Amino acid sequence: MKPVSELFNNRAGGNATMWSISPDDTVFDAIKVLAERGVGALIVMKDGKLAGILSERDYTRKVALLGKNSKETYVRDIMTANVMVISPKTRTLECMAIMSEKNIRHLPVVDGDTVVGMLSIRDLMNDIIKDHEFTISQLESYIKG
């Protein structure tokens, strides 16, 4: 399996796009960003450093189901602060194992002290599909001679 950095290089535009918010933002503002960007989680940054992650699950479980007001609740109050991170060199198979074991769908990618991207389960699934399509194509070519 390939390193995460290779997945980012294969993305449209060849980058590791990520969206971030501040712990001082309201949950309502965070949910707007999630919806506008079509992503399931945001990196939470404070003073240029990783402070946590906010996911749709955090919102659902810690705001919506508890009847809290998203315009009066702050990201810092519901974010996951103790975040599992990976490096750009982490292999995709290891990422799948981490996601499965921890029951998570997003992993911030950190190079040294710098957050360089966010890996999602969607990224991993798209990569598996692409690899399988390539394998099928190769097998078909071999069979046809």
Regions found by a protein language model. Name each.
Residues 1-145:
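Tandem CBS (Cystathionine beta-synthase) repeat/Bateman regulatory domains
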